[in-house]
């Protein structure tokens, strides 16, 4: 008896909740401004690409 009530409550909560739909609405960052998105992606991907080179440079200069 109690289990059925819990099940009905959880399904009704899920049914009542609604998120925005559409392209880019399920991402943790905004895709509305393409220039800001370009800058953020360049910074993110560029830092990952450049990190090994900076680490090697640091190790070579460390002596």
From Swiss-Prot:
Mitochondrial matrix face residues: 17-33
Bilayer-crossing regions: 34-60
Record has Cell inner membrane as a keyword: no
Topology versus the membrane: Single-pass membrane protein
GO biological process, one term: mitochondrial electron transport, cytochrome c to oxygen
N6-succinyllysine sites (modified residues): 25
UniProt pathway annotation: Energy metabolism; oxidative phosphorylation
Cellular location(s): Mitochondrion inner membrane
Organelle transit peptide residues: 1-16
GO CC entries: mitochondrial inner membrane; respiratory chain complex IV
Modified residues (N6-acetyllysine): 25
InterPro entries for the chain: COX7C/Cox8 (IPR004202), COX7C/Cox8_sf (IPR036636)
Mitochondrial intermembrane topological intervals: 61-63
Keyword Transit peptide assigned: yes
Keywords on record: Acetylation, Membrane, Mitochondrion, Mitochondrion inner membrane, Transit peptide, Transmembrane, Transmembrane helix
PANTHER family: CYTOCHROME C OXIDASE SUBUNIT 7C, MITOCHONDRIAL (PTHR13313:SF0), CYTOCHROME C OXIDASE SUBUNIT VIIC (PTHR13313)
Function, in words: Component of the cytochrome c oxidase, the last enzyme in the mitochondrial electron transport chain which drives oxidative phosphorylation. The respiratory chain contains 3 multisubunit complexes succinate dehydrogenase (complex II, CII), ubiquinol-cytochrome c oxidoreductase (cytochrome b-c1 complex, complex III, CIII) and cytochrome c oxidase (complex IV, CIV), that cooperate to transfer electrons derived from NADH and succinate to molecular oxygen, creating an electrochemical gradient over the inner membrane that drives transmembrane transport and the ATP synthase.
Family: Belongs to the cytochrome c oxidase VIIc family.
Subunit structure: Component of the cytochrome c oxidase (complex IV, CIV), a multisubunit enzyme composed of 14 subunits. The complex is composed of a catalytic core of 3 subunits MT-CO1, MT-CO2 and MT-CO3, encoded in the mitochondrial DNA, and 11 supernumerary subunits COX4I, COX5A, COX5B, COX6A, COX6B, COX6C, COX7A, COX7B, COX7C, COX8 and NDUFA4, which are encoded in the nuclear genome.
Protein name: Cytochrome c oxidase subunit 7C, mitochondrial
Organism: Carlito syrichta (Philippine tarsier)
Gene name tied to this protein: COX7C
């Amino acid at each position: 008896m109690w289990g059925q009530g819990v099940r009905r409550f959880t399904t009704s909560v899920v049914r009542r909740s609604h998120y925005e739909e559409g392209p880019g609405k399920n991402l943790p960052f905004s895709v509305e401004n393409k220039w800001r998105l370009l800058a953020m992606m360049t910074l993110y991907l560029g830092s990952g690409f450049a990190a090994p080179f900076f680490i090697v440079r640091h190790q070579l200069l460390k002596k």
